[in-house]
């Protein structure tokens, strides 16, 4: 299994893991858990879920997640 996309900085350090879903798929805890499992090996500081209708972004802080109100700009990653 693998994630759908990773955003990297110019030093090729991973900044954000992205999991895309179909518009008919609700962004549930199960979907979030899938991204979190992928991140166990990658250790990316941000997780994003998107189904084309809504997006959820969470910052990973010491094995806890802080949900963000909006998708950060690339320059702010």
Sequence positions of predicted segments:
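A short, conserved, highly charged catalytic patch centered on acidic carboxylates
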Residues: 1-46, 53-77
